[in-house]
Amino acid sequence: MEMVNIKINNMPLSVPKGISILEATRMAGIEIPTLCYLKKINEIGACRICMVEVKGARSLVTACVYPVNEGMEIFTNTERVRKSRKMTLELILSTHDRKCLSCVRSGTCELQQLCKEFGVDDEGRFDGANPVHEYDDSAIHMIRDNGKCILCRRCVAACQAQHISVIGANARGFDTHIGSAFERPLDSVACVSCGQCIVNCPTGAIYEKDDTAKVLEAINDPEKFVVVHTAPSIRVTLGECFGMHIGTNVQGKMVAALRRLGFDKVFDTDFGADLTIVEEANEFLGRVQNGGVLPMITSCSPGWIKYCEHYYPDMLDHLSSCKSPQQMSGAIIKTWYAEKMGIDPKDIVVVGIMPCTAKKFETKRDDQAASGYPDVDYSLTTRELGRMIESAGIYFKHLPDEEFDNPLGDSTGAAVIFGATGGVMEAALRTAVEKLSGEELKSLDFTEVRGTDGI
């Protein structure tokens, strides 16, 4: 790899030729603020927050798209740079809905954080036209509020990366806004509910539809028996909501928090995952032995199912007919568990804590109520659960570790790997191979299906 010699804030540095100034400064331990940049996904220099000074250049340049070259001298924190960034933030705020106190992203908003860092107050020097912005709450899983949109286009890039492209930049000039084709509401376009636009939005312009109030209402209803079950990935992501290190396993504290929120039973979705493993393995064996449609594709992701329905309907016969662990858990709770406990299913409210907004859509599908009742009534994201715990005044870090309730709190290690790429297929293969061979596996690992080739 060819290297070039540059200086960043008078500090000499050798970096690969052709990388952006932003990448070079990060290699040097210097952070340049951005609002639109997503590496290899959205490198368009739209927000203009990352402007830096380059010796010999007539104007400031955008660090995220400007390549380094031999002898370049870069300055990231001059008075000219700071003034430019502050003015850009003021201009963004001039047309921004500044209802920060009631915004779901208050405290985690990237725009809010940068305004704080650069001393930009709520008043501002500029007064924008503040046009009427679209507010779209038609979808089951999310809300779009263009009043908080800063036109960074991260959501557009994320949607394109998923090969969906249901949102884009509409109109031109000052009237430019993010929307779907022909300004159609989200519930009438081919959105797969994956939520990647939500994850990548730097502000509160796109966010998950909050069902916490409905869940709390059910908890406070003495006639309702409210059961919650949590996906395997939640236990290693929830801690981030409370300032804990990324990936910290907080399973015990999560269970304790859910009990303190008032849930009657706290179960593990891994139990449903084990059921899914057995069902999918048997379905696969049935297809192999009876000349069924092959290859069989696992179907635990409702976003993947919706993607297939919209874009590849000819592949639907290849999908496993098994429900996802979320829905299997709900179905078991409202049938077998209800019968064992002597509870009328109509009085049971099942809540799933899931990592994906597509799970919200899944709970409302017509084919997910075979017992006459919805398998799962509400699906909450990690963020929603985090807000519930905070609003209840629960000091999460100081909670004791507690265990899931039996019997739907027990599971195998195969269920846990559902949270990893290829985990569903690998878990099903373990069962299928043992059934075909009649022997216990010597090795549980099927690394070929993990999708890590080339990584």
Q: Residue locations for each model-derived region?
A:
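Iron-sulfur-associated redox domains of electron-transfer enzymes in respiratory
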Residues: 5, 12, 17-81, 208-455
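Residue-level recognition of oxygen-bearing side chains
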Residues: 20, 154, 196
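Fe-S ferredoxin-like electron-transfer domains
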Residues: 48-193, 206-225
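Intrinsically disordered or highly flexible coil/loop and linker segments, enriched in small
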Residues: 97-98, 109, 120, 124, ...
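Structural motif corresponding to the C-terminal cap of alpha-helices
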Residues: 163, 201, 337-341
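Phosphate/diphosphate-binding loops
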Residues: 195-210, 259
